[in-house]
A protein has these predicted regions:
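Glycine/small-residue-rich loop that forms an oxyanion/phosphate-binding "nest" at active or ligand-binding sites
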Residues: 54-112, 117
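Pre-active-site segment of Zn-dependent metallo-hydrolases
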Residues: 12-49, 54-61, 72, 108-119, ...
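Active-site neighborhood of phospho(di)ester-bond hydrolases with catalytic His/Asp-centered motifs
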Residues: 21-23, 40-48, 68-71, 135-138, ...
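Active-site-proximal beta-strand elements of phosphoester/diester hydrolases
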Residues: 2-5, 19-22, 99-105, 133-139
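Binuclear metal-ion centers of metallo-dependent hydrolases, dominated by the metallo-beta-lactamase
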Residues: 66, 78-91, 174, 178-225
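Active-site environment of divalent metal-dependent phosphoester hydrolases
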Residues: 27-28, 49-54, 74-77, 91-94, ...
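Active-site-proximal loop/helix segments of hydrolase catalytic cores
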Residues: 112-178
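Zn-dependent metallo-beta-lactamase
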Residues: 1-18, 25-28, 94-97, 202-210, ...
Length: 225
């Protein structure tokens, strides 16, 4: 499996299938790629905020990728001609040779457009099993059931927000990394803007003091596991 970080919370996972998570590309000040360069089978969304929903419609239309997200987001996307599979907390779906399961996150979620309005607390994390197992925590605070997520799904890789302000910060994320106990932890959702500026090396130090194995990626870099 290859995991490529495109900055913020956007990753491309190349396992049994090719998946993009939270495709915030256009307008992302740290993303090194364009929508035109993206070629994926599946779009997986954690929630509806613009810095996560991003280019979902454009990628779905131009690349024919299937959307996996919570029910309300799939309903919205369907109005724009995007084919999707709706899931909800604790449930999941198999597409191709990839299984995606939705798990809780503690945040908020909502979008408004001219033709559709939705606002509600429906954020999520995602367990993506595509050869290896990846836990994308979405935007979230620290919560104790991260221990259960680690125990139940045994992820090979955990993708954790560390930026603070809107999510847990580096200190909280270090504790999350210990609880989840993935083989590799990769920080995300930081340094996109000054308001979520964090030192990833400080996170790495705190997490590794708790027994985690942290790999820091720069936008555009990938790791193979």
């Amino acid at each position: 499996m290859k995991i490529k970080w495109l900055g913020h919370s956007c990753f491309i996972i190349e396992g049994n299938d090719k998946i993009i998570i939270d495709p915030y590309i256009t307008g992302n000040p740290v993303c090194p790629e364009s929508v035109e360069s993206i070629d994926v089978d599946i779009i997986a969304l954690t929630h509806a905020h613009g810095d996560h929903f991003g280019d979902t419609i454009k990628i779905g239309k131009e690349k024919g990728a299937k959307l996996v997200a919570i029910y309300e987001i799939v309903e919205y996307a369907s109005k724009h001609g995007i084919e999707g599979e709706a899931i909800n907390m604790g449930g999941g779906v198999r597409i191709g040779n990839t299984e995606i399961t939705m798990v809780p996150a503690f945040h908020s979620s909502g979008f408004t457009s001219a033709d559709f309005k939705f606002c509600g607390a429906a954020p999520a994390g995602l367990i993506i099993k595509s050869g290896k197992t990846v836990y994308h925590a979405g935007d979230t605070s620290l919560f104790s059931d991260m221990k259960l997520i680690g125990e139940l799904y045994k992820p090979d890789v955990a993708l954790l927000p560390i930026g603070g302000r809107y999510t847990m910060d580096a200190r909280q994320a270090a504790m999350a990394a210990e609880w989840i106990n993935a083989k590799i932890t990769i920080p995300m959702h930081y340094n996109t803007w000054d308001v979520i500026k964090q030192d990833a090396n400080e996170f790495k130090k705190m997490a590794e003091e708790r027994g985690a194995n942290v790999v820091i990626l720069n936008p555009g870099e990938e790791i193979e596991i």
